[in-house]
Amino acid sequence: MERSHKTEGGKAVRREAVFQPEFREDLRHWVEIDRKIALRALTIVEAVLRDPFAGIGKPKPLKYLAPGMWSRRLTQEHRIVYLVGDDRIDFLQARYHY
């Protein structure tokens, strides 16, 4: 899955979405336990692909873990964690609080 968004210079940046095994397992968990949370996770994924640094879920850089790592609030307890690269966004987890 690829999406593009505009940067400050107006140039479109395309990034590929890469879903790591832990993220896929977390998403399966939410489908079984609470489908509303699973749908919210997918909505957040779409928002991240549009703009990884702004939008729903209160994006927050995780500067102490790794450069380019961000989180967004899925529920009060759980976060989606993703890593933004030049040409891809790795979705790492969708459960727990980093």
Tell where the protein language model's regions lie, with residue ranges.
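Enriched for short, Lys/Arg-rich terminal
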Residues: 1-16, 24-43, 56, 62, ...
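Generic structural signal for secondary-structure transition and capping sites
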Residues: 50-53, 67
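Glycine-rich, flexible loop/turn motifs
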Residues: 49, 58
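Solvent-exposed, amphipathic alpha-helical segments
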Residues: 44-48
